[in-house]
Amino acid sequence: MKIQLKSKDEIEKLRYACQLAAEVLDMITEHVKAGVSTKYLDDLCFQHITEVQKATPANIGYRGYEKTICASINQVICHGIPSDDKILKDGDIMNIDVTVKKDGWHGDTSKMFLIGKSEPHNQRLVKVTQECLYLGINEVKPGARLGNIGAAIQSLSLIHISEPTRLAS
């Protein structure tokens, strides 16, 4: 699959939507701490997107999903559903995934958080995962194939982790 190139105008609209999504993660960072529910974080993100950014939380309504963010804790790899029952604890690893829709364009991003004091192996996991992300991003360029991104990530992850997670083709 070849990556489709966008016009300069399309890139600017896309970039703006992505900036809004990144801004949500910046805003929520100070609230991500032990004792907080993922539902509380979801509510804060909803309020910020709709009231401050005058945008739409793109996840809401997608295939019946009713939340603003995905909040994945520890062994939940992705798309965890925020809940009043999911309370962050010291030592947790959490990923928040947010998608903002503005003027028809989607900005989608996520951020990994270490809650409180984390074990060294958790810190290493987050560090290696981020390195893999940047290596994959480096593969994105005109004419590149999407498989190149996965191959780059896999090559680095195999150095650090004995069995990387693989998605079914």
Where are these regions (language model features)?
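Single conserved hydrophobic/aromatic residue that forms the stacking wall/gate
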Residues: 159-169
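Residues forming anionic-ligand binding surfaces in small-molecule and nucleic-acid pockets
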Residues: 22, 125-133
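Generic N-terminal segment detector
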Residues: 1-63
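Short, compositionally biased
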Residues: 107-123
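Acidic/histidine-enriched ion/cofactor-binding microenvironments in catalytic or ligand-binding pockets
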Residues: 2-3, 7, 72-105
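Short, basic/aromatic beta-hairpin or loop at an interaction surface
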Residues: 61-75
